[in-house]
UniProtKB/Swiss-Prot annotation:
Cellular compartments annotated: Cell membrane
Transport among keywords: yes
Biological process (GO), any one: transmembrane transport
Lineage, top ranks: Bacteria, Bacillati, Actinomycetota, Actinomycetes, Mycobacteriales
InterPro entries named in the record: FLQE3_permease
Name of the protein this chain belongs to: Fluoroquinolones export permease protein Rv2687c
Keywords from the named record: Antibiotic resistance, Cell membrane, Membrane, Transmembrane, Transmembrane helix, Transport
Bilayer-spanning residue ranges: 20-40, 49-69, 96-116, 119-139, 147-167, 199-219
Function, as annotated: Part of the ABC transporter complex Rv2686c/Rv2687c/Rv2688c involved in fluoroquinolones export. Confers resistance to ciprofloxacin and, to a lesser extent, norfloxacin, moxifloxacin and sparfloxacin. Probably responsible for the translocation of the substrate across the membrane.
Subunit details: The complex is composed of 2 ATP-binding proteins (Rv2688c) and 2 transmembrane proteins (Rv2686c and Rv2687c).
Disulphide bridges, residue numbers: none
Keyword Transport assigned: yes
Length: 237
């Protein structure tokens, strides 16, 4: 814990210095520009899709961007020679970006709808969805030396995490097999936050528990990939 607090402070400083915080504010303004001109009756329909897009930007691309900034500045390899443990490093990164994503989502929803939405499913959907996208973005960026190479390969995990839930939620293909994609649950929660779907008790349990289980697995994968592509290449092992 004594190492985590300075790590959080440093991560927030880096987010400001690298302009990711500014980019998050800009993305929020873009979503407002999309939603506010819509008729009031259409805003709750569009809002879950908008928030999923925000999760993809802040969750997936921002964390990948921070990794490549650290690679460029040669700081990510130096982490292994400090007392900071991997879990503390990852927790600091996830916490700061998660807080940014949640702040943008709540502000956008409140400006667009006032208090005419359900806060609890909104927060749960954003937190769980962003956490999943952060872990996928972090893990997928580690093997690549340049952001250009990562962008080309990132299309695959991004499409897997986003396209099937959107297809299911929109009713284009409501096949139960799509529940295997962990971001399906957060999207259902976002739909419930704006009264677009009514969730059965089992769906609520699925939407909360399954993403957490998948996030735990992604954390272990992130640690393994960090050891292979960062620790070993730094010459420590």
């Amino acid at each position: 814990m004594t190492r985590l607090v300075p790590a959080l402070r440093l991560e927030l400083t880096l987010q400001v210095r690298q302009k990711f915080l500014h980019a998050a504010v800009f993305s929020g303004l873009i979503w407002l520009a999309v939603l506010l001109p819509m008729p009031v009756s259409l805003r709750p329909v569009a809002e879950p899709y908008v928030l999923v897009g925000d999760i993809a930007i802040i969750g997936f691309f921002f964390v990948g961007g921070t990794v490549f900034f650290e690679k460029q500045e040669r700081t990510i390899g130096a982490i292994v020679s400090t007392p900071l443990r991997f879990w503390e490093y990852l927790a600091a990164k996830l916490t700061v970006l998660l807080a940014i994503s949640l702040f943008v989502a709540v502000v956008v929803a409140t400006i667009v709808h006032g208090l005419g939405y359900h806060l609890l499913p909104l927060v749960a959907g954003i937190v769980l969805g962003t956490l999943l996208m952060l872990l996928v973005g972090f893990s997928s960026s580690l093997p690549f030396a340049s952001v250009t190479d990562w962008f080309l390969a990132a299309v695959i995990p991004l499409a897997i995490m986003l396209a099937p839930p959107v297809v299911h939620y929109s009713g284009l293909w409501p096949n139960p097999v799509l529940y295997l994609i962990p971001t399906q649950g957060p999207l259902l929660l976002l739909g419930a936050a704006f009264d677009q779907v009514s969730l059965a008790p089992w769906q609520v349990g699925y939407a909360v528990v399954y993403p957490i289980v998948c996030a735990a697995g992604l954390c272990r994968a992130a640690k393994a990939l960090f050891g292979r592509y960062v620790v070993q290449r730094s010459g420590v092992l």
